[in-house]
Amino acid sequence: AWDPGNPALTGEPPAGQTYTRGTPNVWSAMSYDAKLNLIYLPTGNATPDFFGGERTALDDKYSSSIVAVDATTGQVRWHYQTTHHDLWDFDLPSQPLLYDLPDGKGVTTPVLVQTSKQGMIFMLNRATGEPVAKVEERPVPAGNVKGERYSPTQPYSVGMPMIGNETLTESDMWGATPVDLLLCRIQFKEMRHQGVFTPPGEDRSLQYPGSLVVMNWGS
C-alpha cells in the first residue's frame, strides 16, 4: 500500500487507525512494469476541484501527477506533476502507456506516455521520471479570488502533439445561423478567457478545454 500522508505505512493500518484521508486519489487505471517493479499511479487533483486555498503541501505535492511506486516496498521512486496547484480538475484521466522507444541505433529507452485533460501528452523515462519529450514551464495568468494562491507557471509538453487546447478567439465561435453565431460571439466577448489555464473566479470565465473533454477516462 502507499499512503502519501504516512509513507512509513506500507500495509494495512493498525486497528483503530485509517489511511490519510482526503489525499489526491487514483480514479483511473494504473500500469505496472515488471522489469522495473514499478506501479505507475495517475493521480487526481486535490479537492475541492476549483479552489485550492485550503490545500496542504501534501495535496499540492502529489495532485495531478504520475507517481511511480515500488511494488515491493510501497515507497515512491519518483513523481512528476503535469499541473501545478490544479484549479481546473485537470487530473490524469487514463493509465500510463508503457513503451520502449527505439533510437534507430539498436538502443531503446523505457518510456511512459501519459495523456491529460488539457490536451497535452507527456513522455517520461519510466525508470527516472525525467521528460524524454521536451517540457517547458510557461508563465500563466493569476486570479484574484480571496484566499486562493496561484502557481506562476505550468508545464507545457511542447515536444509532443497538443490537441484541442488552443486559446479561443471570437472568430472561433460557431452558429448554425447568423443569429446563432452573433449570440455566441456576444457571449464570448462577455466572458474572460486567458487560454488553457484561465483561473476560475467570481466573474464569468470560459474554461477551454473543460475538465470533461480532450482526453478523458479510458485507454
Which role fits each region the language model picked out?
Residues A1-S219:
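Beta-sheet-rich non-transmembrane sensory/scaffold domains
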